[in-house]
Amino acid sequence: MTPRKLALALIACASTLTACDDPNLLQAQLATVADTYDVFALTGTPASFPSGINTYIRSTVRVDGNANFDVAFDIDDSGKVIVYPVQKVVSSLTSSRRVGLRRVDGAFASVTIAPSGTYADSSIVALPGEVIVLQSMRNGASDACQFDISPYIYTKLTIDSLSLVSRAIRVQTVLDPNCGFRSFESGIPSR
């Protein structure tokens, strides 16, 4: 490339970058979404019943070896809900499909941002009303964050209610579908 073409390319690139307020600032494109799901315990219910949630596609799913879920749910002998990240249920996962869980203090409505720091890859025993934040890695082939700077999607959830007779669990969630963004406030996140 000649020096003149190189100079023109650099000027064009600089003009493009300075056309925005801050070329380093990523902007979210999608609004956060609140959902309510009814799932069933992994044990004591038919295998055809949905026991998991795929937070990104916003759907309850059957829990099987396909690992098409972020978290699965069960009810222990004392009547408490156990929340399992996908890698605790399906062992043959790729490294690009991990989910971390973190218990967060406060009421569900008051948790407006996913905390930074460590998310454990272990199960959590949850009581109704407790808040859990999921950090779901979505950077596999043809996945949502495949080409983004951050591979993580964040969701907060709480156990709304459960029935020990039917082994049904009602779960409330708020999903921030923007890769790397942590906001649970309604609308398009700014952080």
Go through the PLM ranges and name each one:
Residues 20-191:
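Surface-exposed, beta-sheet-biased, low-hydrophobicity segments with strongly acidic/polar composition
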Residues 1-20:
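Sec-dependent bacterial lipoprotein signal peptides
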